[in-house]
Amino acid sequence: MQVDTVRFGTLSVDDDKIMLFPKGLPGFEDERRFFLMDHAGNSKIKWLHSADSPELALVVADPFDLFEEYRPDVPDEIARELGITGPDGALVLTVLTVRAGQHEGEPPTISANLLAPIVISKERRTGAQVVLRSGEYGVRHQVHLRLGEGVKHTAGCGAGGMGSVGGVGSVGGVCSEETVATA
């Protein structure tokens, strides 16, 4: 299918790459169809782009690449709703917020929303943004990476314990959370 975007022009996206978010995302409840694309210049960063709204694109990353101790505990009922049957069946993303430097020449600051990861069933390609029940995480965890390069070093978030999706063990994948940069 052809998808018009403000930031990237017209893109050709295979139908099997479209992910369905039955309840949309917080703040974008009417947006249900999204796809992932790589960010040029940094393999750690991706774009979660709406298939229907040309201007809606969120900067996302794999939270496990950025925060080694991150262990989100996704409620069993949400895992069941999405069709996630095991840890290898989940893709987890964190939404990144990129803020311009305060002064000319100052690099941007980047934060990750670890409180509300985006969880996607790899098999069914259905997803949801999940607000975690524990108080361990917040919406602004500082990330140390450069937009044009790979991660320079990680920032720990002090999480303890093993995370799980549907009670099946720790989850790996791509991070998610707060809604950030729109195109």
Task: For the regions a language model picked out, list residue spans one by one.
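Short beta-strand-centered segments at strand-helix junctions
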Residues: E69-E77
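Active-site-proximal loop/hinge segments that shape catalytic or ion-binding/gating pockets
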Residues: V171-A183
